[in-house]
């Protein structure tokens, strides 16, 4: 009996070592530039740029197949960050892909919702919870404001509500300078 256990343990260790070696040996390297570009994009997965999501758009920019000014949710600020990363001149946002809008989240009127689940299927980030024939709810922290859930709704119970700029959603608009850096630069 102990022989069978030791054989199984030995096989498990051998297979584990082979799999570990294979993972290191045949590791697929991603494009580091595409990963940096993807980190700058807003991750709304809205498709307004003409690509199915932010990652494919980042890969197309890295390959030179797409321009840096096709992301309306990223706005002019996103275009400037991409231009800085790639070392090119910033361009105005391409209006053919849409215009920047204030940040907003979807809101479902639960009294009108019929529970058809079409909005759940359309949401690229799974920000809608609910079941068939029951009312649905938006998970506001997950919603990216892509508006892809609006069109499939047969009863138009979904609306976009701007995010209030209160304390939890407030963002400092100016560059952050660390006090330690300021103190070091003023020393003689």
Swiss-Prot record:
Residues 29-88 form the 4Fe-4S domain. Residues 1-23 are annotated as: Hydrophobic. This is Ion-translocating oxidoreductase complex subunit B. InterPro entries: 4Fe-4S_dom, 4Fe4S_Fe-S-bd, 4Fe4S_Fe_S_CS, Elect_transpt_cplx_RnfB/RsxB, RnfB/RsxB_Proteobac, RnfB_subfamily. Pfam families: Fer4_21 (PF14697), FeS (PF04060). Its cofactor is [4Fe-4S] cluster. Part of a membrane-bound complex that couples electron transfer with translocation of ions across the membrane. GO terms for biological process: electron transport chain. The gene is rnfB. Residues 104-133, 134-163 form the 4Fe-4S ferredoxin-type domain. [4Fe-4S] cluster 1 binds at residues 46, 49, 54, 71.
């Amino acid at each position: 009996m102990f022989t069978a256990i030791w054989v199984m343990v030995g096989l498990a260790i051998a297979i584990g070592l082979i799999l570990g070696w294979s993972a290191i040996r045949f590791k697929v390297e991603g494009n580091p530039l595409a990963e940096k570009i993807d980190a700058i994009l807003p991750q709304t997965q809205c498709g307004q740029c003409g690509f199915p999501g932010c990652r494919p758009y980042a890969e197309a920019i890295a390959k030179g197949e797409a321009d840096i000014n096709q992301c309306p949710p990223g706005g002019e600020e996103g275009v400037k960050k991409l231009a800085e990363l790639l070392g090119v001149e910033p361009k105005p946002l391409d209006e053919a892909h849409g215009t920047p809008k204030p940040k907003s989240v979807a809101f479902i009127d639960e009294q009108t919702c019929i529970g058809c689940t079409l909005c759940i299927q359309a949401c690229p980030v799974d920000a809608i919870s609910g079941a068939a024939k029951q009312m649905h709810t938006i998970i506001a922290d997950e919603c990216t404001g892509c508006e892809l859930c609006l069109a499939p709704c047969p009863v138009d119970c979904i609306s976009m509500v701007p995010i209030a700029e209160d304390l939890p959603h407030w963002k400092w608009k100016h560059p952050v300078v660390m006090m330690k850096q300021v103190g070091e630069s003023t020393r003689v």
